[in-house]
Amino acid sequence: MLTTDLIIIGAGPGGYETALLAARRGLSVALIERGEVGGTCLNEGCIPTKALCRTAAMVSDFAEAEAFGIKDVAFTLDFPAVMERKRAVVKQLRDGVESLISNPNIHLLRGEARFVDALTVEAAGERVTAKDVIIATGSSSAMLPIDGNTLEGVLTSRELLDIDSVPQRLCIVGAGVIGLEFASVFSAFGSEVTVLEYAKEVLPHFDSDLAKRLRQSLGKRGIKIETQAAVKSIAKEGDGLAVAYERKGKEQSVTADKVLMAVGRRANVGTLNLADIGVEFSPRGIAVDGNMQTNVPHVYAVGDVNGLMMLAHAATFQGIRALDAIMGVDDNLRLDVIPAAVFTMPEVGMVGLTEDDCKAQGIEYVAKKAFFRANGKAVCLGETDGYCKLIAAVDGRLLGCHIYGPHAADLVQEACALITRGDSIADLQGIVHSHPTLSEIVQSAAHC
């Protein structure tokens, strides 16, 4: 039996980043992974999707070249080459992770993990015991429990990332982050895209004003989006798939060559034997406290598996919090201030409270908004669609930032830093920004 200071189950961002930090702090770590290191994000999520987003953005640029004085632009999308580049990007980054965890303080075990007792885990035919255990097993794509969900051509996001040709017609069930990103990508690649969303608006957890504007923008790009659409079944229809749904009391149907199920994710807890060791969990994930500790002492859960926030960077920082708790280290992490991004065209970036959040919590607030059409850099880029909205308390303290437009995912980080520090609108107004830059949009909103 191997004895170590810390066992980490899962080598995604929440697992391998925590393992590296623990090793740097002098702990011995057993890191267990049943698949490829890097987790969903690197192998079948954030990274491969962003590689495709880059190609889609280039296609969009070529299509608009004449507006910039570049005429007679002809190009052909070589989809196999696009996918090969995607695989190369993933491999490069995965090789980097493999190199990082080749650390004398980290013992990598490849195999399915299961608890023997609270502090003993078995994997790859070997038992490991430790003082503390961190579960970082991530999540898997959910499927609607409807007839036809197992038909050929009904895909998860992982499966869609491995297709060998662009579908002529693509139906996406779910208008969350995953659904809208794939809608943008495959629309740019030439697919006829229809998105069906059960809620009243796309991106249900984002600022509702922003979500509406994004939906309208995607519609102008040829993406058909139906909200308040309850998908009932999927059936074979000729060479395609008929997706039946109900919208406002009317039965409707859309035919597609491929159907993407983008209806959320579920925590990977099935094979761990959690019930046997008394860890409390539900379909939403493993229950944890503010230090990411479960109800069983010395057993922690970070990332998607606890269901708090299914984002790679949230997993990383939850891992830091868990390790700090294990080692008795005080930290100043603000795990309530987690930015999020949607890599559509245009992008979305957000952090903190929305207007709806403030109303629900009874918080008096002020909303300030500046538009990219008045930003010099955005006009030069020809990307003027969108705005930055700041949410502030009546005392000026910054509570939220919501950006829809070029490079929104990057721009929101400034507001994230300010909110984390507890800074105010006045503090933001006093920060000098370079001109002309997109970042001026954030300060412009502060002055509105």
Task: Please state what every model-predicted region is.
Residues 2-3, 20-27, 32-166, 194, ...:
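Glycine-rich flavin
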Residues 2-4, 124-132, 249-258, 295:
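Core beta-strand elements of the Rossmann-like FAD/NAD(P) dinucleotide-binding domain
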Residues 15, 179-180:
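N-terminal Rossmann-fold NAD(P) dinucleotide-binding loop
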Residues 7-14, 18-35, 40, 47, ...:
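Flexible, glycine-rich terminal cap/loop adjacent to redox cofactors
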Residues 19, 23, 183, 187-188:
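Gly/Ala-rich phosphate-binding loop of Rossmann-like dinucleotide-binding domains
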Residues 1-12, 166-173:
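Beta1/beta-strand and adjacent pyrophosphate-binding region of the FAD-binding site
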Residues 150-167, 253-327:
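FAD-site-proximal beta/loop scaffold in flavoenzymes
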